[in-house]
Regions:
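Non-heme di-metal
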Residues: 1-121
Length: 121
């Protein structure tokens, strides 16, 4: 596990360097567009998480041998989606190294990312 963590940390550092190099060759407008595109990809991932929640509920209903009531379904759906969003989206959007890198590139981009993280929380 330790070696895996070290390898992942190296990837993150390399990714930051690559992003900085790309940004140095980009106009402010291109950087803003890249952040917009990044957020669109996040929206696509969120759609996948919403679909996964529906699959999870179907699996749960089959496992317990009965359908959930509307209230139960809404409660499970809300909790599961919040959990997935935090795990796969919000934790990354709020990661300190990521937010510092974005702040260096685009303060307005950081604001949009922070707003997105809050909306998903």
């Amino acid at each position: 596990l330790r070696h895996h963590w070290q390898e992942e940390a190296q990837h993150a550092k390399l990714d930051t360097l690559v992003a900085a190099e790309l940004a140095s060759q980009s106009t402010p407008l291109q950087i803003e567009q890249a952040i917009d595109d990044f957020l669109k990809i996040g929206g696509i991932l969120d759609g996948g998480l919403q679909q996964q929640v529906q699959f999870d509920i179907g699996t749960l209903e089959r496992a317990i041998g009965r359908p959930l009531t509307t209230a139960q379904r809404q409660e499970v759906e809300s909790a599961q989606l919040k959990s997935y969003r935090f795990t796969f989206l919000v934790s990354g959007l709020e990661q300190p190294n990521f937010t510092r890198a974005i702040a260096d590139l685009s303060p307005s981009g950081l604001t949009r990312i922070a707003q997105t993280a809050r909306a998903l929380s």
